[in-house]
């Protein structure tokens, strides 16, 4: 099985989901196209890692883990984790910042800020929902099942904050270094 297979199994370990829901949850930390997700789900269903029930009202398939799927996740989490892959087009552009016009630099940083402000705005209601769940003593089991998701959303929110602060710092440094030239 490939890494995407294990990621999907991890998502299903939390709760049964449709393929669309899996895509939404995965976007917190993994990118995959719907076609990839459904291809992998079909293969894992054939191999016995997941099964699905068709919702008669919507004709959507709701996927769940089988015992074989639970065992696969349990074994996979013990394996060494691969180094994260980092590809950031913005950073490639920043690498040649000294060659850019000042207006281009300003636009580049403004675009980056806009992107991370948008992501922070998406994270905020998710974070608030999970923090409400955390503080509700009547929903302890639901909090337990959502704890990993909370850690990921919180990390993503913190990274947005850090990225925005870095943009301010880097642009200030650029101006203090290049405005005099």
Question: Language model features by range: what are they?
Answer:
Residues 1-90:
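Basic helix-turn-helix/winged-helix DNA-binding cores
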């Amino acid at each position: 099985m490939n890494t995407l297979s294990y990621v999907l199994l991890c998502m299903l370990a939390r709760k049964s989901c449709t393929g669309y829901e899996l895509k939404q949850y995965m976007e917190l930390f993994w990118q995959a196209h719907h076609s990839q997700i459904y291809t992998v789900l079909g293969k894992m269903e054939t191999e016995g890692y997941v099964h699905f029930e068709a919702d008669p009202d919507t004709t959507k398939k709701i996927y769940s883990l089988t015992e074989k799927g639970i065992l696969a996740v349990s074994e996979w989490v013990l394996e060494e984790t691969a180094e994260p892959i980092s590809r950031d087009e913005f950073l490639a552009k920043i690498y040649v910042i000294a060659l850019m016009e000042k207006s281009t630099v300003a636009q580049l940083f403004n675009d980056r800020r806009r992107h991370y402000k948008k992501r922070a705005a998406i994270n905020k209601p998710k974070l608030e929902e999970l923090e409400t769940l955390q503080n509700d003593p009547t929903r302890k089991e639901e909090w337990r099942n959502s704890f990993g998701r909370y850690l990921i959303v919180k990390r993503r929110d913190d990274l947005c904050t850090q990225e925005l602060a870095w943009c301010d710092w880097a642009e200030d440094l650029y101006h203090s270094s290049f405005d005099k030239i």
